[in-house]
């Protein structure tokens, strides 16, 4: 299955929430009406079954993190085999992806842009170049921008945008050096309350 290449705002409208797929330099509210799903007759929302609600939540989270269906299922199986809450384990695995951590640290405006930086070998983990977006980051790992990539205007622009975001407790970023430390796994309370991981667990448990 190929990665989605269509209009990104259409995905946000489909899920009824900002999936942070665009740069953030303009308010997404000025670009589209999130409360209206895409399509000519998008204003009227159909009544959804329990299964449809669970499926929509899974699609929302999958698109938020930019993960394809097959990889998402692998994460769920791994989360279900681990100790603790399956839903929280799933979110932790998604948060530990290198492309997500690069985005969280502000080196990329979006997770998609962060994946490009990784594939172009602009990102290092513990001083080693890693070009795998799904690479799992562990506590105390150091993520940095490669020296030859530090003058890229898109990275500088992303860091400027990051200054406007809320500081995250589980990572520490040195903007001047363009590097950061993944201090710990994020707790559930650290992450978005708009995600209902229990619906995803119910979907895959059937």
UniProtKB/Swiss-Prot annotation:
Its BP terms in the Gene Ontology are: ribosomal small subunit biogenesis; translation
| All residue ranges annotated as the S4 RNA-binding domain in the record | 96-156
Record's GO cellular component, any one? small ribosomal subunit
Q: Does the entry feature the keyword Transit peptide, yes or no? A: no
What are the protein's GO molecular function terms? rRNA binding; structural constituent of ribosome
Which keywords does this Swiss-Prot/TrEMBL entry list?
Answer: Ribonucleoprotein, Ribosomal protein, RNA-binding, rRNA-binding
Ribonucleoprotein is among the record's keywords? yes
PROSITE patterns from the xrefs?
RIBOSOMAL_S4, S4
> Function, please?
One of the primary rRNA binding proteins, it binds directly to 16S rRNA where it nucleates assembly of the body of the 30S subunit. With S5 and S12 plays an important role in translational accuracy.
Q: Which PANTHER family match?
A: 30S 40S RIBOSOMAL PROTEIN, SMALL RIBOSOMAL SUBUNIT PROTEIN US4M
> Could you say which protein family the record assigns here?
Belongs to the universal ribosomal protein uS4 family.
**How does the annotation summarize its subunit structure?**
Part of the 30S ribosomal subunit. Contacts protein S5. The interaction surface between S4 and S5 is involved in control of translational fidelity.
**Protein name (Swiss-Prot/TrEMBL):** Small ribosomal subunit protein uS4
Q: What is the lineage of its organism?
A: Bacteria, Pseudomonadati, Pseudomonadota, Gammaproteobacteria, Enterobacterales
């Amino acid at each position: 299955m190929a990665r989605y290449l269509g209009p990104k705002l259409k995905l946000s409208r489909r899920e009824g929430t900002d999936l942070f797929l665009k740069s953030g330099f303009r308010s997404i509210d000025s670009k589209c009406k999130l409360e209206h799903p895409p399509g000519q007759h998008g204003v009227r929302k159909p009544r959804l079954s329990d299964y449809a609600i669970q499926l929509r939540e899974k699609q929302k989270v999958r698109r938020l993190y930019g993960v394809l269906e097959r990889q998402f299922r692998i994460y769920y199986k791994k989360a279900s085999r681990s100790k603790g809450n399956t839903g929280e384990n799933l979110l932790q695995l998604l948060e530990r992806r290198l492309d997500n951590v690069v985005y969280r640290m502000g080196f990329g405006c979006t997770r998609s842009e962060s994946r490009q930086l990784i594939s172009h070998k602009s990102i290092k983990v513990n001083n080693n170049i890693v070009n795998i977006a799904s690479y799992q980051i562990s506590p105390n790992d150091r993520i940095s921008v490669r020296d030859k990539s530090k003058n890229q205007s898109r990275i500088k622009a992303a860091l400027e945008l990051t200054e406007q975001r809320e500081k995250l407790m589980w990572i520490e970023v040195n903007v001047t050096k363009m590097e950061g430390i993944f201090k710990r796994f994020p707790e559930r309370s650290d992450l978005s309350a708009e995600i209902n991981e229990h619906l995803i667990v119910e979907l895959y448990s059937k």
